[in-house]
Each structure stands twice: as C-alpha cells, then as structure tokens.
C-alpha cells in the first residue's frame, strides 16, 4: 500500500493554457500557449498516467491559493482582504506574506501529519527567500542570470537560502531550498531535491509527507532581465519531470503517490472556468493512459492524501471533498518515468522594452 505522499505545488496556470490542444481532454486549442513544445514532461505524464480535465483550484490568487493548498481553508479575514490587502498579502513567500490572521485555526496539512506522528519534509512552501550576493558589498537581489550561472557552477556569486515564515515548519524545512524567488531556476530546486533523495535512499527511509514548491511556471511576464514566459514554464516542466523520474527510480516508488496542482490559476484563461487548472496524480498504483473527468479541486487532493496517510480532515471543506478514487487501480505498474529534455533554452531572456518596435506593444 502507499506509505509516501509527495505533494507538488506549482504556480498560476489554467488547464487550457497547457493542455488545451490535447484532443483526449476537454480543451480549446486556441487558448493553449504553453503546449507540448514548452511542456513536454507534463504532456508525457498525462499520457502515461491520468489526464485530469475537470479539476479546479480552490483559490484564485497566491494569497488565498497557498492557504487553500495547505489548509483547505480561507479565513473570513482573508476573504475580506480582497478589497485591497491592507495588512498583508499572506502567501507565505516573504516578510509581507506572514499573517496569522490568514491561517486556518485548524492548522496546516503538516500540523495534521505531525499530530499523527508522521515524518515530513517541506521544500520551499511558506519559506521566505534569502537569496543574496556572496559579496556583502553588493546590494539588491541577484538577477536571474547571476543565479543561473551559480546553478550551472560557472560562478559562486549567489547564496541560495530561505527562512521559515511559520516557525513550526523550521525543523523539517531545509534552509538551502528556496521557495518563491523567480530569479532562482527551478533546476536548482530539482537538484537540491534529488540530492536529498539520494541521501534518503542511502538511509533507507523517506518521509511520509513531502511538500515541494516549484514556482517558476508563474513566470516574470515580459519584465526585462528575466527569462521569457516560455523559458520559465519550460524550466518548471523540466524540474517537475526530473523530480518525478528520480522518485520513480527510487526504492520508495512502490509505496508512493505523487500529486501536483497549481496554487491558483490567476495568470490564465480557460473556456470552462477561470478556476480550472492542471493537476497530476502519478504513481505505480495510478491508472495508466486514462482520462479522468470526475470533478475535483484542491481540497480533493488534500482529502486523498489525508486518506492515504490516515490523517483526519482539517475542516468541513476537505471532509466533504471528493477523494480521487477514480485515478487509482488495484493493478500496480512499477515502470519508472523517463523525463525528457527541454526544447526551449532556459536562459532565453526577455528583450528590453526599447527593443520593441511596435509603438502599441511598447506602451
């Protein structure tokens, strides 16, 4: 049976943006901007495992999206903050993202896991970035290319670190894994994760609940000195594929299930609903090559993970959520996943606004 759950939280994509051109699912091709050329691993994963074409985010932006993704809840205070977020933007990604009034009184999924005596590892969720220059005389946040060169081993100019936004996660959240910081490539996150996976294999133990923040499919838009949106999404796709491959080739695979969803769908469009999103259910006990059109949302993923790990619901929302029974089979297939390389250069950068010749686009 399943003993290990890996929960990947990504950033801000809708179903049609990524899978709209897939004929197997309910999509609209003219809304697809990050198709198979940019997201080959995500397309391969939904081909080999299940394509979820009727799954929705519970949140609409990061402030409530990360609360729904980790607590299955959004407080009354947070809902009323949508008038302008006067006190904080409580996504847990920085100093202004810390706000106890936004946190569910029932706690987070890791609190529920701890109460059951389960082991946990949290990579980046509710961890504030402390990315900085190694030279203290240098000021400001290092730009993407400096971080990219540090990841590639071409320099050691940048230090990748983070700190917990919530003190209770410190003991199981490595400071070397950076959560939200778009200057840091998702490849650096995948490298960190896979390095620790090797250590877990050497020890012969793996946590019951693993949470992984992979934020770069959020993109930096068309901001100068940042990768293009396609490069950002390709970065996240490759990192996700590499992590799944590593897990599928580990000794823990036979007792594992991987779930992934966007924290919110804010940045995109969809012909069914602005809340419809990309979601994944992966593992040896998951159906192969199936389309699952059962209606699920963020709380469905949490409810399924809770049932697998024997964790009671945190509140009425996950208690009443539909578990993802339709994704699973009693005929296990232990074949590993083979990731595929990116087609888009990960360091393809946005042009300067001055390079845009069309006066309308320049504005």
What residue spans do the PLM features occupy?
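N-terminal pro-sequences and low-complexity stem/linker regions of secreted or lumenal proteins
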Residues: 1-363
